[in-house]
């Protein structure tokens, strides 16, 4: 199991949580490959992955074997789409990977989805920082909302 996250073009993503999750599940059916070429994505996402790979090299790159000798947990697995990049990391590097992904998302103005979070947090760039745009609502609040609407 890995720690997973996704960065994406904010303009491409739906703004409400349910629609976003539908978009995410459509993207992760992996029907629009190949997914190993950074040139096929946007300039902002390309810049993000290029910098992310300085800290967490691509496990599918020719240089991966060199990094395996030092610390196999340092490698990242990158799936590169036109409007998103899905990235997986060793759980032992989750905090470091999340921190670097967030820093670079702010720098490059891309959205960030914490795939491994129980709350399904989606962050969008706003004036050089990231703000929580939406997340999964707790079951209690979903039930309360339905009751209040008479369902």
Task: Give short role names for the model-derived ranges.
Residues 1-151:
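Acidic (Asp/Glu-rich) sequence patches and key acidic residues
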């Amino acid at each position: 199991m890995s720690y997973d996250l996704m960065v994406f073009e904010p303009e491409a993503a739906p703004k409400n949580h349910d629609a976003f999750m539908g978009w995410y599940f459509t993207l992760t059916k992996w029907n629009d490959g190949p997914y190993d070429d950074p040139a096929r994505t946007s300039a902002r996402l390309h810049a993000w992955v290029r910098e992310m790979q300085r800290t967490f090299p691509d496990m599918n790159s020719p240089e991966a074997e060199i990094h395996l000798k030092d610390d196999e947990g340092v490698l990242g697995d990158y799936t590169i789409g036109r409007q998103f990049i899905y990235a997986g990391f060793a759980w032992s590097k989750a905090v470091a990977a999340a921190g670097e992904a967030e820093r670079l998302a702010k720098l490059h103005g891309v959205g960030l989805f914490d795939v491994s979070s129980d709350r399904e947090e989606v962050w969008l760039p706003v004036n050089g920082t990231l703000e929580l745009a939406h997340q999964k609502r707790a079951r209690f609040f979903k039930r309360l909302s339905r009751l209040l609407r008479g369902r």
